[in-house]
Design a protein with these regions (language model features):
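Short, solvent-exposed loop/linker segments at the N-terminal edge
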Residues: 213-223
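Cleavable N-terminal signal peptides of Sec/SRP-targeted secreted and luminal proteins
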Residues: 5-21
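Structural beta-strand segments of beta-rich domains
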Residues: 110, 221-229
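Active-site-adjacent substrate/metal-binding segments within catalytic domains
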Residues: 79-103, 108-125, 131-132, 191, ...
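Extracellular glycoside hydrolase catalytic/binding regions
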Residues: 444-448, 459-462
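Extended acidic/polar, glycine-enriched regions
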Residues: 149-154, 230-314
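Accessory beta-strand-rich segments of carbohydrate-active enzymes
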Residues: 22-33, 46-53, 88-200, 234, ...
Length: 462
């Protein structure tokens, strides 16, 4: 099949998905019950690109009402291409602006989850500024929207996405040997939190770590997990009273009743939770488990793999990497999210084709260069048994950047980006390595990287 025919198939696949009207996220984690989660993906966005080089994206006097959006855009997609750039390679530097409306349950608070908004992102709901994001254009982040800001119908979301290189608005985008795409390049989710009699506590995420793993004990096969359960509330403050919840593994329909009091950060840490009928994940047998957390009718389902990375000494005295006690040789490729036609917003078919190429090439290891990855890609790596190297945005980071710990400086946003990358990647069995801006954290500031990881995920072992 010729190159043009393949491109046409990819475009038709994307259009079919839009026509099907898929509203819930298809990637993990999954949500159900009273926790209503929909995406704002699709062709319903009004759009324009401001090409004025003097336009100030941080101007506090700017209002969405002052802008006329003169064309349509599909989300997710790259503003570089929407504005007429060469497919997959080049595009304009400017400020993309998006607007659409959505309905919402009356009286409910919402959380907006952006899987990516590149580079600098600023968001309004019904004309009210709800927040911005400077920590890089390839990481997921969320913004809470107060219930008082919302209406029952026709809520307007307005998003500004500035893809210009600028140390103030986009400190993480230092350049590099690839094209930095702009716009709403991945999905946008709306998480609805109706108020209930029990206080409207919802499970936000449940980060899973195999229990009692130690890299120096390579033969250990984990059968239990540690869970860091992050909570969200429709109230203005984090929940602090005892929370009753259930855990159900692999959709068995046998929920375990539990209760715990959240810490000051609104999280509950569970240690050594047994996994029924535990099966190990490996590169040759990528078996996955699920755990569903339910609080007052709102359910969150996370997918994870039981695996243990270790190091053991071979007969010749060399240290060898192991998974579940077995020596494994990793062979792989660097992988960029940069396709013709779709650029950094690939279709599912394009991702499937790349997984097939990796498998055909005998790869069991892939490096995600040079930025945090799309959740759909991480799901596919989990299922294919391909190990992943995940890194924050790089690689053109200078030593002076890593020495900037000032308020609002480079390292403040680098630590935020690392946390957000971990939030999105932590449960994926394929993830073996998390790296900060290429290799500089290992060479210069490994202690700061280690602190960042432990601060955000205290159950992790190093």
């Amino acid at each position: 099949m010729g190159h043009q025919h393949l491109i046409m198939l990819f475009m038709l696949s994307s259009l079919f998905s839009l026509a099907a009207g898929i509203q819930s996220p298809t990637y993990w984690p999954h949500f159900s019950g009273d926790r209503i989660v929909t995406t704002l993906d699709g062709p319903s966005w009004d759009y324009t690109m401001n090409m004025d080089p003097h336009f100030d994206s941080m101007d506090p006097s700017f209002t969405p009402a002052s802008v006329a959006l003169d064309r349509k855009a599909t989300v997710p997609s790259c503003s570089d291409l929407v504005h007429g750039g060469a497919s997959g390679y080049l595009g304009p530097r400017g400020v993309a602006m998006y607007r659409r409306t959505f309905d919402h349950a009356a009286g409910a608070k919402i959380r907006l989850q952006f899987q990516s908004c590149s580079f600098y992102c600023k968001v309004w709901i019904n004309g009210h500024l709800v927040g911005d994001h400077k920590a890089g254009g390839y990481v997921p982040f969320w913004l809470d929207v107060p219930a008082a800001t919302m209406k029952a119908k026709d809520n307007e979301i307005f998003v500004l996405a500035d893809n210009r290189f600028n140390a103030t608005t986009a400190p993480m985008h230092t350049g590099g040997d690839f094209w930095h795409y702009g716009g709403l390049i991945r999905s946008v989710e709306v998480h609805s939190m109706p108020t209930t009699a029990s206080g409207a506590v919802y499970p936000w995420r449940a980060w899973v770590m195999p229990s009692a793993t130690n890299i120096h004990q390579p033969f250990r096969a984990p059968t239990a997990i540690d869970i860091t359960l992050a909570l969200m509330s429709s109230a203005s403050s984090s929940p602090t009273t005892t929370v009753k919840f259930t855990l159900d593994f692999d959709g068995a329909g046998s929920p375990q009743k539990m209760s715990a009091t959240p810490n000051a950060n609104g999280t509950i840490i569970l240690k050594n939770v047994p996994v029924p009928n535990p099966m190990l994940w490996s590169t040759t047998s990528p078996t996955m488990h699920t755990v569903t957390v339910t609080i007052d009718g709102a359910s969150l389902s996370e997918r994870f793999g039981l695996r243990h990375w270790g190091v053991k000494t071979d007969t010749d005295g060399a240290s060898r990497l192991t998974i579940n006690g077995e020596i494994v040789k990793l062979v792989g490729w660097n992988h960029h999210t940069q396709w013709p036609v779709t650029a950094a917003s690939p279709t599912d078919a394009q991702m499937d084709a790349d997984i097939l190429l990796l498998k055909q090439g005998g790869a069991n290891y892939v490096r995600g260069a040079h930025y945090p990855q799309d959740p759909r890609w991480l799901d596919r790596l989990d299922e294919a048994g391909i190990v992943m190297w995940s890194e924050t945005l790089g690689p053109d980071v200078k030593l002076k950047n890593t020495q900037d710990f000032s308020k609002g400086g480079f390292m403040e946003y680098q630590m935020q980006q690392m946390q957000e990358m971990l939030d999105g990647a932590f449960n994926h069995a394929s993830i073996m390595t998390c790296v900060e801006f290429f290799l500089l954290c290992v060479l210069h500031y490994s202690n700061d990287c280690d602190w960042c990881i432990r601060e955000h995920h205290p159950d992790i072992e190093s």
